[in-house]
Amino acid sequence: MDTTAISPLTPLGVIPDLKNATSVPFNETACENWKEIHHLVFHVANICFAAGLVIPTTLNLHMIFLRGLLTVGCALFIIWATLYRCALDIMIWNSVFLVVNLLHFIYLVYKRRPIKIEKELSSLYKRMFEPLHVPPELFQRLTGQFCNIQTLKTGQAYAAEDKTSVDDRLSILLKGKMKVSYRGHFLHNIYPCAFIDSPEFRSTQMNRGEKFQVTIIADDNCKFLCWSRERLTYFLETEPFLYEIFKYLIGKDITNKLYSLNDPTLNDKASKKIDRQPSLCSQLSVMQMRNSMASTSDSEDGLQMFLRGTSSSSSLRPGRTSPYLRTSAKMKPIEESVEDDVFEAPSAEKLELQRLP
């Protein structure tokens, strides 16, 4: 009598062969019969994948190379699956990967495209902004939206003392030379790639309605880049990196103007060599010069005193201040409460405490 039990899940009249059922999975798992090696296209595709993954991230264009190699690898896989394997699923999946990597590759190449800077602004970018690692596309945004290039002929005035407002613009000289004077007395020159009105911009950031305390005249046919001050300020608030760049450049420009005041014979080549971090004392000295000339009753004597050099003011005994360094009621000097605390004179109580054992 046959004692083999028929499973309820087994179709009627069909008895499973247990020997064959256990032997087939064993043969497939053991891989006793290896299939032949795939076509060369398959291996080249995998080589592209491997090469893309081992590209070092320190390489400047590593993402472009990675996406490019992945795109080539996916294309080779599609060729292999279509011509040599006839596998529809492999072809579909690699087609999806190909589209994704190709789009990313095009996007990366587009971002790396060379930014065309106007010829008139190329020297400005290379001298002032490129050394500070400002990207060309950011510089293009800075100079392409709310600024324009203006010209002045020889003898024309950029600003007149007590007449021109300082609230309207901020400019950088691109070509030519300008002369800064106070009541007919020459102070210093302004050369290309230098701010024209940086002291006024720095001192009146918190105060509006001020007027220029000096006269700025074109000593040659000049061309300058002019920003709308209000729109520039708003733009810098949205770009913290550029905001810090402008703070540095304006401070450095004020320092260069201070050196020009101390040495009126300083030319453009010598001014290029001045590359120091601007200090508070330097900025205060420039502003005190312009403020004091506008406030002193004997302004002619004060001007001559200042033009002889700032060494006379530094030789004053502690506790005495020069009458020519009084601040103006019109042009308010820079207020830096933190730095002012450093230069406070020690009080008598502090000296007594220091003498105690």
UniProtKB/Swiss-Prot annotation:
Region ranges (Disordered): 309-357
Primary localization: membrane
Extracellular-facing ranges: 1-38, 84-89
Membrane among keywords: yes
Membrane topology listed for this record: Multi-pass membrane protein
Swiss-Prot/TrEMBL keywords: cAMP, cAMP-binding, Cell adhesion, Cell junction, Cell membrane, Developmental protein, Glycoprotein, Membrane, Nucleotide-binding, Tight junction, Transmembrane, Transmembrane helix
Residue ranges of the TM segments: 39-59, 63-83, 90-110
GO molecular function: cAMP binding; structural molecule activity
SUPFAM superfamilies assigned to the protein according to its UniProt record, in alphabetical order: cAMP-binding domain-like
Quaternary structure, from the entry: Homodimer. Homodimerization requires the C-terminus cytoplasmic region.
Its biological purpose: Cell adhesion molecule involved in the establishment and/or maintenance of cell integrity. Involved in the formation and regulation of the tight junction (TJ) paracellular permeability barrier in epithelial cells. Induces primordial adhesive contact and aggregation of epithelial cells in a Ca(2+)-independent manner. Involved in epithelial movement during corneal sheet formation and regeneration. May play a role in VAMP3-mediated vesicular transport and recycling of receptor molecules. May play a role in the regulation of cell shape and movement by modulating the Rho-GTPase activity.
Family the UniProt entry places it in: Belongs to the popeye family.
Protein name from the UniProt record: Popeye domain-containing protein 1
Organism this protein belongs to: Gallus gallus
The organism's taxonomic lineage, starting at the top: Eukaryota, Metazoa, Chordata, Craniata, Vertebrata
Gene that this polypeptide is encoded by: POPDC1
